[in-house]
Curated annotation (Swiss-Prot):
Biased composition (Acidic residues): 182-200
Region (Disordered) location: 22-42, 178-201
Subcellular location: Nucleus
Biological-process GO terms, alphabetical: mRNA splicing, via spliceosome; RNA splicing
Name of the protein: Pre-mRNA-splicing factor SLU7
Length: 536
């Protein structure tokens, strides 16, 4: 209700006021009228339709919502394009030197530059243009349709109508051509009758509607028509499908999840129901139907190609990715067909070959064959066994058996010489004996190696004794050699004290004897010995 002043109302009056507003919104009561006689839309909320208290409005009105600060000088008119004003007969001072118009200068002139301007010729002086200036508001400056003439769109409509007429004419010609080809041999009467039937079948009669399906739609409620946009004269029941929202198909909490933000339900809400009776089986069906699979394959191909170094990106260049995917599929099919042809050329095609004889399939035939006691054929024709594609009974390189007549250690060979190398020369019994001898020698070597691994040689004791870490108890030292070793050790220690006395022709002896080790031990200073200071 668009009331200006707020006065106290009883509970009954307030209830009647609410009922009146609901009736106006439903279109069952006439809308409220303002002081100018215009109807007020009942759907306008009260905080917008009620005038403020300081306006002292006695009657309902919407004037307080109008722009009372509007500029009276504002106009929606636009430039008069191409309008001309006064045209002079001779050049005027300050006019354009090229055309002679006063509204612009030579730099801004839009005419073709003359060889001799109007300033010097006074010929063909151009008229002055109509220059206008408008005061536009914020929206007017940004209105892209400001100054648009709707009548110019009639040319577009005319183009579409001409195109539609040409299309209908072409379709009619094609239909007549088909009818003439189909009924060229029949009479003119039959041709005319069938042509009419064909045209009637091609046309769609929009007036034929099933009345039983429109019974609910025919229910009309009488309502009052208002100009405020609140309701229309007749309101039909548009919800006649009687469908159910997908989130109401199964009210179980543990059923398919419904996302209210995206309005999606991926899983099937009724998985146990009959598929023939279900209209909705979940949004995942759209991912496995239509062009979704092709788009998925396209994305996978783009990812794999990018990983292999191809400069391809599905989002940055989708057309390029699609063309590359098409060329990839063509090459793949071509390669597949080439491989198939090679295999069929090499092994043949059992599907296209001649059928197998019946006697081979069933194991019997109607042919009568008689044999004697030795197995020879007396009467009838001998059954020719199928030949192998390999040459049979052909001995090469002096072999007496064919390749594959001998098998040993997962290898094929010749039985005559027991060789496993194909196309080798036959060695006969000598080759067999040599192969056996080499095999026996290999076995003996392997047995000897195993025995040697069981008893390792003791070289470690000799090395330990040489370096003095472990000296046997039964060692016998020569006194002369020991004295010489002591002298040599003393000389070596003196050389360590002063290496400058060492001569250039020194001969070193790397052999270490037991006497040398004993002399070294006797001359060595033990750091833990308390009498080490009295040794020298």
């Amino acid at each position: 209700m668009a009331t200006a002043s707020v006065s106290f109302k009883s509970r009954e009056d307030h209830r009647k006021q609410l009922e009146l507003e609901e009736a106006r919104k439903a279109g069952l009561a006439p809308a409220e009228v303002d002081e100018d006689g215009k109807e007020i839309n009942p759907h306008i909320p009260q905080y917008m339709s009620s005038a403020p208290w300081y306006l002292n409005a006695d009657k309902p009105s919407l004037k307080h919502q109008r722009n009372w600060k509007s500029d009276p000088n504002y106009t929606k008119s636009w430039y008069d394009r191409g309008a001309k004003l006064f045209q002079a007969n001779k050049y005027r001072k300050g006019a354009c030197e090229n055309c002679g118009a006063m509204t612009h200068d030579k730099k801004s002139c839009m005419e073709r530059p003359r060889s001799v301007g109007a300033k010097w010729t006074n010929i063909n002086i151009a008229p002055d243009e109509k220059v206008e200036s408008f005061e536009l508001d914020y929206d007017g400056k940004r209105d892209r349709w400001n100054g648009y003439d709707p009548s110019t769109y009639t040319r577009v409509i005319a183009d579409y109508e001409a195109r539609e007429e040409a299309r209908k004419k072409y379709l009619k010609e094609q239909q007549l051509k088909k009818l003439e080809e189909k009924d060229g041999e029949e009479g003119d009467e039959n041709v005319a009758s069938e042509e009419e039937d064909e045209e009637d079948g091609l046309k769609i009669d929009e007036a034929k509607v099933d009345e039983s399906a429109q019974m609910d739609f025919a229910k009309v409620e009488k309502r009052v028509r208002t100009t405020g946009g609140g309701s229309t004269g007749t309101v039909r029941n548009l919800r006649i499908r009687e469908d159910t929202a997908k989130y109401l198909l199964n009210l179980d909490v543990n059923s398919a999840y419904y996302d209210p933000k995206t309005r999606s339900m991926r899983e099937d809400p009724l998985p146990d129901a009959d598929p023939n009776d279900k209209f909705y089986v979940g949004d995942n069906q759209n991912r496995l139907s239509g062009q979704a699979l092709e788009f998925k394959q396209l994305n996978i191909h783009a990812w794999e190609a990018f990983d292999k170094g191809q400069d391809i990106h599905m989002q940055a260049a989708p057309s390029q990715a699609e063309l590359l995917f098409k060329s990839f599929k063509i090459k793949k099919e071509k390669l597949k067909s080439e491989n198939k042809d090679k295999i069929m050329e090499k092994y043949g095609n059992a599907a296209s070959e001649e059928p197998i004889p019946r006697e081979l399939l069933l194991g019997q035939s109607e042919k009568e064959i008689e044999y004697d006691r030795t197995g020879r054929i007396i009467k009838g024709q001998d059954v020719a066994l199928p030949k192998s594609k390999y040459e049979e009974d052909v001995f090469i390189n002096n072999h007496t058996t064919v390749w594959g007549s001998w098998w040993k250690d997962h290898q094929w060979g010749y039985k005559c010489c027991k060789q496993t190398i194909r196309n080798s020369y036959c060695t006969g019994l000598a080759g067999i004996e040599a192969a056996e001898a080499s095999a026996d020698l290999m076995k003996a070597n392997m047995a000897r190696k195993e025995a040697a691994e069981d008893e390792p040689v003791r070289h470690e004791e000799k090395r330990l004794a040489t370096w003095g870490t472990d000296v046997p108890n039964d060692i016998v030292l020569d006194k002369k050699l020991l004295d010489e070793a002591l002298k040599k050790e003393g000389a070596r220690r003196k050389e360590e004290m002063d290496e400058r006395k060492r001569k250039y022709n020194v001969k070193w002896n790397d052999e270490v004897t037991a006497e040398d080790m004993e002399a070294y031990r006797m001359k060595r200073i033990h750091h833990d010995d308390p009498m080490r200071d009295f040794l020298h």
